[in-house]
Amino acid sequence: MAASLIVEAGRLVLCDQATADLAGAKATLSADLRELSQQADLILVFGGDGTMLRVAREVAGSNTPILGVNVGGLGFLTAVSSEQLPRALACVWSGDFVFEQRSLIEAGVQTHEKIVQQTALNDFVVSRGTVPRLVELEVGVDDAVLTRYRCDGLIVSSPTGSTAYSLAAGGAIVSPNAEVFTLTPICPHTLSNRSVIVSLNSVVRVKVLSRRVETVLSADGQVQTQLSAGDTVEIRRSQRAVSLLRLVGSSFFETLRQKLHWSGSNL
């Protein structure tokens, strides 16, 4: 349906190679995601937030806006449902939209084997692996030590990621335009440990102290790197961002009311 709506409006449809193969499209109309982001005026992503996160990392730094169409689950990042797509595209053609720049975050870690760099839109998580034992982490912000955690893990989320894993672990909901990191421990052994909010311009350092517990770094819950005792993960704001398209009249707070079933959903 989406392709026909776009063609009827006199626009050209491009798709990434994997989608082209799945749909049986001609190879001349396909490109990899990075190449596509340089050629297209708008990227349509069909799926849930997981699909949006993957695409955002792959096209990071591109100025091409992304419009997410939710055919998955909760969908905080997917702006419209499949039923709303015809109206949404009509709004796009008429210019009834705004761009939202979402900062990405980066993590760098020098393991015993190599230097690893990862990018995320939502969050980085340093956590235990498959064995259900507490990990011990030392956390610092810039040049200051924050604390040591004995916990299942630590979530360092961007403003965009505040409604993801961090929210489920008791973290605060943060407006996407707030320039902050949210540091949320997962099941900390010290009951007074709570979510901490620091500037997005800070560098958050997480040092692995545990020697007998498998520890991993996860980017957006999708890309994992094995960590060892003594490894330090440095998380900072990326110089790259992604542009999400939002229809005029919609807002982050409207999304909260609808997705979380808060009072006022019918306003």
Which residue stretches match the model-derived regions?
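Gly/Ser-rich helix-loop-strand patches that form or flank binding pockets
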Residues: R54, V59-V69
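Short glycine-/acidic-enriched loop or helix-start segments at secondary-structure transitions
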Residues: A25, R54-A56, L77-T78, E136, ...
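Catalytic core of DAGKc-family lipid kinases
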Residues: G73-D152
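Short glycine-rich anion-binding loops that position phosphate/pyrophosphate groups of nucleotides
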Residues: D49-T51, L74, T160-S162
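ATP/NTP phosphate-donor binding region
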Residues: M1-L42, E83-V98, V109-Q118, V248
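ATP/nucleoside-binding phosphotransfer catalytic cores, i.e., glycine-rich phosphate-binding loops
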Residues: V126, D142-V145, N193-L267
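Gly/Ser/Thr-rich active-site loops/lids in small-molecule metabolic enzymes
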Residues: L134, T147-S192
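N-terminal glycine-rich "phosphate-gripper" loop used for MgATP/nucleotide binding
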Residues: V45-D49, A56-E58
